[in-house]
Curated annotation (Swiss-Prot):
Taxonomic lineage of the native organism: Bacteria, Pseudomonadati, Chlorobiota, Chlorobiia, Chlorobiales
NCBIfam families, sorted: xseB (TIGR01280)
PANTHER family per record: EXODEOXYRIBONUCLEASE 7 SMALL SUBUNIT
Primary localisation category: cytoplasm
GO terms, biological process: DNA catabolic process
Gene Ontology MF terms in the entry: exodeoxyribonuclease VII activity
Signal sequence annotation: none
Subcellular localization, as worded in the UniProt entry: Cytoplasm
Descriptive protein name: Exodeoxyribonuclease 7 small subunit
Protein family according to the UniProt entry: Belongs to the XseB family.
E.C. number(s) listed in UniProt: 3.1.11.6
Subunit structure: Heterooligomer composed of large and small subunits.
Region feature Disordered, mapped onto this chain: 65-95
Reaction(s) catalysed by this chain's protein: Exonucleolytic cleavage in either 5'- to 3'- or 3'- to 5'-direction to yield nucleoside 5'-phosphates
Amino acid sequence: MPASSKSRTSAVPTIEELIQRLEEITRNIENPDTGLENSIALYEEGMSLAEECRKRLLETRKKLETINPAETARPAKPENAPESPRMNDLFGTES
């Protein structure tokens, strides 16, 4: 049976699935009915997922730099966009 993107047999989640889970975790932590212990467990899971997302984004960036180094030499930033130190931290770049 051929594997399709909709019927993946791999246990490795896509980055979109990781982000979806992070959003779910955020909603649960923000819910006042979520207990402290559960919030801590959710926070730990979220930090782990965020690190996995960061690693995958860095891998993707490296692939893009290999494909077209001239286009990825400097991060694209819209004109008059505010500085985002969090994005710089995420990718390990400077503005």
